[in-house]
Design a protein with these regions (language model features):
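Gly/Ala-rich beta-loop-alpha elbow adjacent to hydrolase catalytic centers
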Residues: 9-13, 17
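Active-site nucleophile loop of the alpha/beta-hydrolase fold
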Residues: 32-42
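Active-site nucleophile elbow and catalytic-triad environment of alpha/beta-hydrolase enzymes
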Residues: 79-96
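Short beta-strand/loop motif that positions the catalytic acidic residue
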Residues: 99-100, 106-108, 112
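Conserved alpha/beta-hydrolase "acid-adjacent" motif
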Residues: 113-119
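Catalytic active-site module of serine/aspartate enzymes centered on a nucleophile-bearing elbow/loop
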Residues: 138-165
Length: 165
């Protein structure tokens, strides 16, 4: 028989996972989005097309972590051409949410400074799945896989997959 997979995604990776789950429902047993991104509220998004013509890169985003012991390895600069393409892809992923029918687990922090918490509600409420859960991990910021709540994130992800395998 065909193998089905669980997709576990972080940040922009969630847009990729949502797109895949919408396009290939027969291949996806479940979807986990961690600090998932389908909405960008930053007003600079309206100028992404112009910005990419003016400068090749902008400062990157890193270390949105509450844990003083935590650290994230990230790029110092972010290419503006990639940012424009990312915005276009995110719009498409958001439009594809109603075609996602697999079990869904959404985890996010109300204290995320990188991806607005409204994204969690947009994902949770936007999918067609009847089997869906939203967990807030508010002792952390954006990188919830490395932050204070990381063990809760790992355990919840494990249980979600185990209970649906």
């Amino acid at each position: 028989g065909r193998d089905r997979v669980f997709l576990v995604s972080l940040s922009f990776g969630s847009a990729l996972a949502i797109d895949f789950a919408a396009r290939h429902p027969e291949k996806v047993a479940g979807l986990v989005t961690l600090a998932g991104l389908v909405l960008i509220r930053d007003p600079r998004r309206f100028f992404a097309g112009v910005i990419r013509r003016v400068t090749k890169s902008i400062p990157g985003v890193a270390n949105d972590i509450a844990d003083p012991e935590g650290a994230e390895i990230a790029y110092e600069r972010f290419p503006t051409s990639a940012g424009h393409q990312m915005l276009q892809f995110i719009k498409g992923a958001r439009r594809s949410l109603p075609r996602v029918s697999c079990p869904l687990l959404v985890m996010h922090s109300h204290n995320d400074h990188t991806v607005h918490p409204d994204n969690a509600l947009e994902i949770h409420d936007g999918v067609a799945s009847s089997d869906k859960e939203l967990i807030w991990v508010d002792d952390s910021y954006h990188v919830i896989t490395l932050d204070v709540d990381r063990h809760r994130v790992y355990q919840s992800t494990y249980e979600f997959i185990k209970n649906r395998s």
